[in-house]
C-alpha cells in the first residue's frame, strides 16, 4: 500500500482552528490555516477566558513544549479552595484543597484571549 502525504486545510483561525492546527502539526501532519482577518489584531478579540481542566489537558496535548510553557506562565491559575476576607481584603479564613498532589497540567486557568491566540499562532507557521 502506498503511503501518501496528508495535508489538512483548516478554515478559520480562531482558538479552535489554531489549536487543531497545532495538534495536527505536532502529530506530523501538514497544515494550512485560512482566516478572513487580515491580521491577528484586525478586530477586537474579547477579554480573559476561563479554560477548565479538560481544556488545559487538550492544549497540553496539542501544543509543543515551547508553546505550552508560555501558555502556562501567562495564564492565571485558579486555586481550589475558599477564602473569606474583610472589606479591606485581609484574609480571615482560607480553606485550601487538602490531600493529593495538584495536577500542573489539568487545572483551571484564566488567560487573555489575545495572548492565547498569539501563542497558538506561533505554532503552525501560518
Positions of the model-derived regions?
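Generic structural signal for small/hydrophobic residues in well-ordered secondary structure
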Residues: 19-21, 35, 59, 120
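N-terminal Rossmann-like FAD-binding beta1-loop-alpha1 element of flavoenzymes
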Residues: 3-33
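Short glycine-/acidic-enriched loop or helix-start segments at secondary-structure transitions
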Residues: 20, 43, 94
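Short glycine- and Lys/Arg-enriched binding-loop motifs that mark or flank ligand-binding interfaces
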Residues: 8-12, 42, 51
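Conserved N-terminal helical subregion
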Residues: 2-8, 52-126
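Glycine-rich FAD pyrophosphate-binding loop
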Residues: 25-47
Amino acid at each position: 500500500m502506498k503511503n501518501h502525504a496528508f495535508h489538512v486545510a483548516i478554515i478559520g483561525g480562531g482558538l479552535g482552528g489554531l489549536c487543531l492546527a497545532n495538534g495536527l502539526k505536532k502529530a506530523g501532519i501538514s497544515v494550512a490555516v485560512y482566516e478572513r482577518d487580515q491580521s491577528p489584531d484586525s478586530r477586537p478579540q474579547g477579554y480573559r477566558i476561563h479554560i477548565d481542566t479538560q481544556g488545559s489537558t487538550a492544549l497540553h496535548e496539542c501544543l509543543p513544549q515551547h508553546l505550552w510553557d508560555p501558555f502556562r506562565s501567562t495564564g492565571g491559575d485558579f486555586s481550589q479552595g475558599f477564602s473569606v476576607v474583610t472589606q479591606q481584603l485581609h484574609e480571615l479564613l482560607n480553606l485550601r484543597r487538602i490531600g493529593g498532589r495538584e495536577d500542573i497540567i489539568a487545572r483551571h486557568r484564566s488567560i487573555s484571549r489575545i495572548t492565547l491566540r498569539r501563542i497558538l499562532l506561533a505554532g503552525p507557521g501560518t
